[in-house]
Amino acid sequence: MYGIEYTTVLTFLISFILLNYILKSLTRMMDFVIYRFLFVIVVLSPLLKAQNYGINLPITGSMDTAYANSTQEETFLTSTLCLYYPTEAATEINDNSWKDTLSQLFLTKGWPTGSIYFREYTDIVSFSVDPQLYCDYNVVLMKYDAALQLDMSELADLILNEWLCNPMDITLYYYQQTDEANKWISMGSSCTIKVCPLNTQTLGIGCLTTDTATFEEVATAEKLVITDVVDGVNHKLDVTTATCTIRNCKKLGPRENVAVIQVGGSDVLDITADPTTAPQTERMMRINWKKWWQVFYTVVDYVNQIIQLMSKRSRSLNSAAFYYRV
């Protein structure tokens, strides 16, 4: 009897000692794994950059909203800035190294010299025919001219907004505009646009469909024309197609990587009265200086404030691709 009890006690002690040894071994192994894992994290953490997955995904509205809690690089370290200016600016400055001077001044505002591009255009009229905005941020300087203020307004409306466009065959079809965002945009060396509104029987309203001389003329020998007619009414068009191309376009919304700076002028260009402009604020501003050096100095001084009003976009504007999307 006593032998059985001794055996039971001995078995219990051996089991307890064995279990205690196994638990201690497991504890040492876990400590080794955890400490080694923490050591690896500490060593590698300075070499890794934080990634915030999903934060920058668009929810609704603009695709260009930058959220405060996302990992963001400094704008000027990863972006390009194009500055568009008229030929008269370079002519007045008359200095072969003026661009290098401005690049060095932009550097004082945090923009590396390789990120600034200077783009010259002849005048507003020629720029309207072939606008090309390729940089992450684009600032267009437009010298005010009372004789060209309507051209300036149309150009501003074109480049400050995105448009979805399709070609129009005016020889075969009638066209109508469905809503206020629907416009007909014409570009070319000389665009003369005539329209004839039609009734439900496709007869001209105040005009003869067989006589273009009776059509209403809405533009004469212009480079850029944004035509707006009565919505929901079919129109027969007459366009100088030999020197002009017309497209059926839909305004999608603001092109947020473009800003227009008006140089001088007693009147301030304003396209926010257009009901299709939403929101009712545009990246348009005015600088009142007589000399171009003073204009460029002001742009350099306020470049970062100007950029804050804009959003970096991936799409560029190229009139050659206007048929699809600009």
From Swiss-Prot:
Coiled coil: none annotated. N-glycosylated. It is found in: Virion; Host endoplasmic reticulum lumen. Belongs to the rotavirus VP7 family. Keywords: Calcium, Capsid protein, Disulfide bond, Glycoprotein, Host endoplasmic reticulum, Host-virus interaction, Metal-binding, Outer capsid protein, Signal, T=13 icosahedral capsid protein, Virion. Ca(2+) 1 binds at residues 95, 206, 214, 216. Homotrimer; disulfide-linked. 2 Ca(2+) ions bound at each subunit interface in the trimer hold the trimer together. Interacts with the intermediate capsid protein VP6. Interacts with the outer capsid protein VP5*. Residues 237-239 are annotated as: LVD motif. Its main location: virion. Glycans are attached at residue 69. Disulfide bonds join 82-135, 165-249, 191-244, 196-207. Calcium-binding protein that interacts with rotavirus cell receptors once the initial attachment by VP4 has been achieved. Rotavirus attachment and entry into the host cell probably involves multiple sequential contacts between the outer capsid proteins VP4 and VP7, and the cell receptors. Following entry into the host cell, low intracellular or intravesicular Ca(2+) concentration probably causes the calcium-stabilized VP7 trimers to dissociate from the virion. This step is probably necessary for the membrane-disrupting entry step and the release of VP4, which is locked onto the virion by VP7. Residues 253-255 are annotated as: GPR motif. The lineage of its organism: Viruses, Riboviria, Orthornavirae, Duplornaviricota, Resentoviricetes. Ca(2+) 2 binds at residues 177, 228-229, 231, 301. Residues 165-167 are annotated as: CNP motif. It holds the Pfam family VP7. Residues 1-50 form the signal peptide. Some rotavirus strains are neuraminidase-sensitive and require sialic acid to attach to the cell surface. Some rotavirus strains are integrin-dependent. Some rotavirus strains depend on ganglioside for their entry into the host cell. Hsp70 also seems to be involved in the entry of some strains. In group A rotaviruses, VP7 defines the G serotype. This is Outer capsid glycoprotein VP7. GO terms for molecular function: metal ion binding.
